[in-house]
């Protein structure tokens, strides 16, 4: 297959998948691995992750690695046919979701995805968590399904993330209008004991304790001016 024909076939995917195509999608379109390798050597494609290639003319986004990891979960299926709760896919979550929401400063370069069933990966940079998500738990960022700020905070509390880190994420999420304090308090009661709150199930007490650790409170945060986000 000549170069122009191969690129034309691949463009059906790259034009609608952030400039990327999986090797399985390429094979299904009639472009084999040998041709992909030849296109890569010729400078038409870059290898993003194992089994995922990007057209070199496509602009890379800040979340290209996450996009590539998500594509690989259901590598044969085009992105435009997948739903946010794709049973064969997953949702960006936990630390990765906080990063995509631009919340907090958690240091973890791994890509974390929540999947409805157990998954494994040979890629040490990809980590899976198994959980059942609801539609209200998921939003979209740059075309990717990502857990909402509320669900992300709940997941991080379940992981026992350091209280100051989680409090900062909560503060920034509230300031960005991604999270309501009253709604959060209703959902985080189950994590109160593990953070040392003496009243089991008291989400408001847990929230107050977390915020006190970074020098603020529910009342202060609810009434403070919202700083600009850049």
Protein language model regions, located:
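Short gly/ser-rich loop at a beta-strand->alpha-helix junction or flexible surface loop bordering the NTP-binding
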Residues: 2-148, 152, 159-230
């Amino acid at each position: 297959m000549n170069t122009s024909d191969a690129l034309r076939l691949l463009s059906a995917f790259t034009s609608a998948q952030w400039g990327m195509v999986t090797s399985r999608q390429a094979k299904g379109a009639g472009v084999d691995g040998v041709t992909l390798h030849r296109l890569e050597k010729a400078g038409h494609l870059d290898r993003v992750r194992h089994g995922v290639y990007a057209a070199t003319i496509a602009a890379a986004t800040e979340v290209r690695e996450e996009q590539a990891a998500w594509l690989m979960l259901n590598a044969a299926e085009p992105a435009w046919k997948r739903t946010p709760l794709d049973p064969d896919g997953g949702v960006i979550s936990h630390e990765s979701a906080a990063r995509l929401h631009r919340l907090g400063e958690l240091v973890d370069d791994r890509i974390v995805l929540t999947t409805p069933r157990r998954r494994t990966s040979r890629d040490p940079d990809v980590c899976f968590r198994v959980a059942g998500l609801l539609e209200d738990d998921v939003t979209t960022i740059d075309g990717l399904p990502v857990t909402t700020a509320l669900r992300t905070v709940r997941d991080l509390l379940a992981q026992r993330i350091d209280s100051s880190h989680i409090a900062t994420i909560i503060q920034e999420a509230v300031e960005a209008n991604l999270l309501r304090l009253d709604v959060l308090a209703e959902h985080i009661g189950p994590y109160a004991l593990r953070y040392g709150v003496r009243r089991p199930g008291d989400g408001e007490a847990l929230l107050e304790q977390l915020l006190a650790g970074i020098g603020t409170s529910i009342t202060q945060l609810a009434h403070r001016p919202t700083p600009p986000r850049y």
